[in-house]
Curated annotation (Swiss-Prot):
Residues 240-249 have a biased composition (Basic and acidic residues). This is Achaete-scute homolog 5. GO terms for biological process: regulation of transcription by RNA polymerase II. Keywords: DNA-binding, Nucleus, Transcription, Transcription regulation. It comes from the Eukaryota. It comes from Homo sapiens (Human). GO terms for molecular function: DNA-binding transcription factor activity, RNA polymerase II-specific; protein dimerization activity; RNA polymerase II transcription regulatory region sequence-specific DNA binding. SMART domains: HLH. It holds the Pfam family HLH. CDD domains: bHLH_TS_ASCL5. Residues 1-66, 214-278 are annotated as: Disordered. Disulfide bonds: none annotated. Residues 252-271 have a biased composition (Low complexity). Residues 155-207 form the bHLH domain.
Length: 278
């Protein structure tokens, strides 16, 4: 059936009209009013298998949207959103955050060789002490494992204890020698250190008075004697030695008092103050 000119002109125009609008929209491209500018770090998603270049999408220039049917969502677009979603909770920062620094390792422990080894065993029974005496002959045990002679203590403690033992030993030896110079009864009696010093002071005073009262060899006065005695008889006159160190004046043992506490010594204020202590 022949068609009119109007119909021939309208037919192709009506069939091409729908495609004309889509071509104009494709040439116009996306509107720049609401699309953000693409950043260099935006996630890009490859298009479909056709290998076409990615096209700018609504989430940046790097986000590609492949051709998809109208009214549907592109799978690549969904995958890009999943890749951009943070893996941790919102309160955590995962991008650009360095891991916390590791704690510095602890300094190495001091070797056991530098640590002093202190051993203080308790008291042991005599059978155990006899058994260990043969095993440890180099350890001087003062008693049944009472207190060690510090074989395992530091050197400065051992030296300090040794000095203290030497000091006590010297003091005891000095008092023993002083008791030996006292008259017989006092030398044989067990005296304390204070009693030994007081008896030595009284004896020295007696010797000084004995020498000062008879400078020319005459007899000393009979009214004075050693403490605790009455008037002492005059000792036999003996010639004085040429040198004062050649002889030693000693009182007879019968004149020595029985007790060192009782004294009727010379009226020295020093001795009177000592006697007032009792």
């Amino acid at each position: 059936m022949p068609m009119g000119a109007a119909e021939r002109g309208a037919g192709p125009q009506s069939s091409a009209a729908p495609w004309a609008g889509s071509e104009k929209a494709a040439k116009r491209g996306p509107s720049k009013s609401w699309y953000p500018r693409a950043a260099a770090s935006d996630v890009t998603c490859p298009t479909g298998g056709d290998g076409a270049d990615p096209k700018p999408g609504p989430f940046g220039g790097g986000l590609a949207l492949g051709p998809a049917p109208r009214g549907t969502m592109n799978n690549n677009f969904c995958r890009a959103l999943v890749d951009r979603r943070p893996l941790g909770p919102p309160s955590c920062m995962q991008l650009g955050v360095m891991p916390p620094p590791r704690q510095a390792p602890l300094p190495p422990a001091e070797p056991l060789g530098n640590v002093p080894f202190l051993l203080y065993p308790g008291p042991a029974e005599p059978p155990y002490y006899d058994a260990y005496a043969g095993v440890f002959p180099y350890v001087p045990f003062p008693g049944a494992f009472g207190v060690y002679e510090y074989p395992f203590e530091p050197a400065f403690i051992q030296k300090r204890n040794e000095r203290e033992r030497q000091r006590v030993k010297c003091v005891n030896e000095g008092y023993a020698r002083l008791r030996g110079h006292l008259p017989g009864a006092l030398a044989e009696k067990r005296l304390s250190k204070v009693e030994t010093l007081r008896a030595a002071i009284r004896y020295i005073k007696y010797l000084q008075e004995l020498l000062s009262s008879a400078p020319d060899g005459s007899t000393p006065p009979a009214s004075r004697g050693l403490p605790g005695t009455g008037p002492c008889p005059a000792p036999p006159a003996t010639p004085r030695p040429d040198r004062p160190g050649d002889g030693e004046a000693r009182a007879p043992s019968s004149l020595v008092p029985e007790s060192s506490e009782s004294s009727c010594f010379s009226p020295s204020p020093f001795l009177e103050s000592e006697e007032s202590w009792h």
